[in-house]
């Protein structure tokens, strides 16, 4: 195992933050795994520690067939943000920016540099594109902030990967994944191993999130150069490992073994591993997800559990105004999987309370919430 420590730029006087990468194995193929980019989403970090131990063991046994890079703490900035006893890990407090938005878009500068050098050899194209992605990131002007510097380091390690896992969670949720529709056939095994509730599929959710910054450039390049052989060569996903409180030992170990079993299936680990379950969740268009909001201020009482299938018109939660004796029941506007609910129980208009993944598209434009 090799430990790589990257000091982040623009640290405050008298302090320094470091992004640590743990590199296992050797070879031409690569997996990149990071956890807790939203720093208060800790099931991924706990799972990453299980992975760290198991990968060291597998490496010592000579079982790894390729490189696996692991970043257990992908956001040391957000890990250090606490306000009056509450961890604030989703947004950078100084700028208000979401830590998982606005990553560098690589396809345009890559196309400008190598468009005339792409041909019919897919493997040669993959190698050239990956090399150029790294060059583009290395040649950018110095980062203007610590957040920008951290973003570049994360993307620099992931841009040449064959498989990228970005480990997150939701407030109270079933396990679910976000991915490209083109990659869903490959992800079905991991979803089944994790017993995920749903997969949300789209090419562009509108936020330049980390996983899409790894996977979507390949689609854009393939469309820009239709005569060239350009496969979607970075299999990237945002993997939501359930609820914010899902950090029990058994949960982390189960997540770890599911991920390792998937990587073994993909040829990165030798040995005997359990076969993926036959039963798997549905892959649904992210355009089919409904966000449900409270119509007024009040206390929320949820009537259904995260992970349940609900029908259009089913009552999902009540909002109670105890001063004016006003009670409003909010119902599902689409049939699908109630895959996440808010953790807060006092709400206001404009704050989402529940998410239902449906089979039919009902939204356009920006799909992801901040």
Enumerate the predicted regions with their spans:
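Structured catalytic-domain cores with a bias toward divalent-metal coordination
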Residues: 1-370
């Amino acid at each position: 195992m090799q430990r790589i420590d990257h000091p982040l730029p623009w640290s405050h006087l008298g302090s320094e933050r470091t992004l640590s990468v743990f590199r296992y194995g050797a070879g031409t193929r690569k997996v990149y795994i990071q956890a807790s980019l939203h720093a208060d989403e800790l099931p991924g970090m706990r799972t990453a520690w299980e992975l760290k131990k198991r990968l060291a063991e597998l490496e010592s046994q000579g079982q790894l067939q390729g490189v696996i890079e692991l970043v257990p703490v992908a956001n040391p900035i957000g890990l250090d943000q606490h306000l009056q006893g509450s961890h604030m890990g989703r947004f950078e407090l100084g700028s208000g920016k979401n830590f998982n938005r606005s990553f560098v878009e690589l396809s345009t500068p890559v196309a400008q540099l190598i468009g005339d050098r792409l041909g019919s050899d897919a493997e040669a194209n993959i190698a050239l594109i990956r090399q150029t992605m790294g060059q583009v990131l290395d040649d950018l002007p110095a980062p203007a902030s610590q957040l920008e510097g951290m973003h570049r380091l994360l993307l620099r390690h992931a841009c040449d990967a064959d498989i990228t896992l970005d480990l997150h969670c939701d407030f109270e949720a079933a396990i679910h994944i976000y991915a490209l529709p083109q990659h869903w056939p490959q992800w079905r095994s991991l979803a089944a191993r994790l017993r995920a509730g749903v997969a949300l599929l789209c090419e562009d959710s509108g936020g330049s999130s980390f996983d899409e910054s790894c996977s979507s450039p390949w689609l854009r390049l393939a469309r820009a150069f239709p005569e060239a052989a350009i496969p979607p060569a970075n299999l990237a996903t945002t993997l939501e490992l359930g609820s914010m409180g899902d950090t029990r030992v058994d949960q982390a170990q189960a997540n770890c073994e599911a991920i390792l079993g998937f990587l073994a299936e993909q040829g990165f680990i030798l040995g005997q591993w359990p076969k993926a379950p036959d039963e798997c969740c549905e892959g649904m268009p992210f355009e089919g997800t409904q966000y449900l909001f409270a119509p007024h201020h009040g206390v929320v009482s949820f009537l259904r559990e995260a992970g349940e299938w609900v029908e259009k018109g089913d009552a999902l939660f009540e909002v109670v105004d105890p001063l004016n004796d006003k009670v409003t029941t909010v119902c599902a506007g689409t049939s699908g999987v109630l895959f996440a609910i808010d953790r807060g129980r006092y709400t206001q208009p404009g704050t989402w309370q529940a998410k239902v993944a449906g089979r039919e598209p009902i939204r356009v434009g920006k799909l992801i919430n901040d």
